[in-house]
Design a protein with these regions (language model features):
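Helix-coil boundary/capping segments in enzymes
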Residues: 1-219
Length: 220
């Protein structure tokens, strides 16, 4: 069996991205949280998957993909924790629907409701639990820089900031894939630069710290 461990739902119907744009705009305007998400039909999901991800998988002989929301669209650097909880739940629900519609081809990996300047705590833990228990997810994407290229939150070895999340991952026996999202730093193009920066920065932070020694089998 050939398993692609890194796939994203990049072909959601347009109302999905439009909702996030409206949500961020409303938050920036008056600080309120837009919670009413748009309807997405099974036919729209099927139209986004069958001629795109699924067709490419069949062409290349891929049997199964670990499938998560669009990474650059996680958008943790915009909004706040409350907006990002709504956005993560909506995004994860769409991925779960893909996995239910095509169970032989896709297994879900979740988006966490991280936010710039907010340590990952109960809101993140709640979505972690929901993803595992209700949606059947087998892993999650973990953004090492929710500030979107500013890198102003603590590094991954910071015990007060990150270790409680690592401990939850170990307790649930699920892995997290380190994956940055969008960039609001004009020096860093999101995909061409920020993604590479993120991987390298996270790798070195793990390599030069005692995370694996202190947490044990840290699932990252």
């Amino acid at each position: 069996m050939i398993i692609d461990i890194h796939g994203h739902f990049t072909t959601t119907p347009p109302q999905v991205a439009e909702f996030r744009q409206r949500q961020v705009a409303q938050f920036q305007r008056d600080g309120s949280v837009l919670t009413e998400t748009p309807a997405v039909s099974d036919d729209e999901i099927r139209a986004g998957i069958e001629p795109h991800q699924l067709a490419r998988m069949k062409e290349r002989g891929v049997d199964l993909t670990l499938f998560s929301p669009r990474a650059v669209g996680m958008d943790h650097h915009q909004g706040n924790e409350a907006t990002n909880v709504v956005w993560a739940r909506f995004s994860n629900d769409l991925v779960a629907r893909v996995c239910r519609m095509f169970p032989q081809h896709f297994v879900g990996v979740g988006q966490l409701p991280q936010a710039a300047g907010v340590a990952p705590r109960q809101a993140v833990f709640d979505e972690l639990q929901r993803g595992i228990e209700e949606l059947g997810f087998v892993g999650f994407n973990l953004n090492p820089d929710p500030t979107g290229g500013r890198w102003s939150d603590p590094p991954l070895w910071d015990k007060d900031w990150w270790y409680p999340l690592y401990e939850k991952l170990v307790a649930w026996q699920v892995p997290a894939m380190i994956h940055v999202s969008g960039s609001c730093n004009p020096h860093f193009n999101a995909v061409a630069t920020h993604y590479i920066n993120g991987d390298t920065t996270a790798f070195v932070q793990f390599l030069t710290s005692d995370i694996f020694k202190e947490i044990g089998r840290a699932h990252v």
